[in-house]
Amino acid sequence: DMYFFAKGIVIPHHYHGVTQVIATYLNREHGVELVDFYKFLFEYSKYSNGFLNQEYKNHTQSLRNSLFKDQTWGRTIDGGDDFHFQDNGATAAELYTNIDIVYEEIISIVKKRYNIDVQEVARFNKHILDLYQPKPQSLTFSKNYYSWFFHNKHLTNMDNTIIIKHNIYKDKIDHARHLFWFGRKSKRCFLTATEKEFA
């Protein structure tokens, strides 16, 4: 369980950014400790019957296969060749690919557990995440999420547009290798973006 908590929750959700903005919002604006949120997410992933539970099963079964059935360590990425990613990277890739389903679950469980609406925060989290699938270059938000998240500014009501710069990849495997395999570049998971306040 502690292995999955680190490799299946903390690394994909925080380090690879899937719920980093959401967790930071809950912490800074509502006093929910990061470790408490991720422990809750772990319990939900383990015992629910949604997509996050399916990924929990895939991740832990892959680990068992590696340890006890002498199979190659890690997993391949859907649509790829025989290149195996560590399970935390493979889980992150699955979460990225199914990001809308992931956020549906996250929004729902956060509302039930904390009575906090994180729909717009999740929308911002997705917007700045370096996803392989195409998405709009600019989105409008009601708060200054970009400067709040990246520059520790006070979160205020402020209609603004966040314009992202898409990264180009040869294919899904090239994307996965850049984000989930090569090195440990800080905030590699987030796109370069600018915040434009409405006049």
Set out the residue ranges of the language-model regions.
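Radical SAM enzyme core and accessory elements
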Residues: 1-199
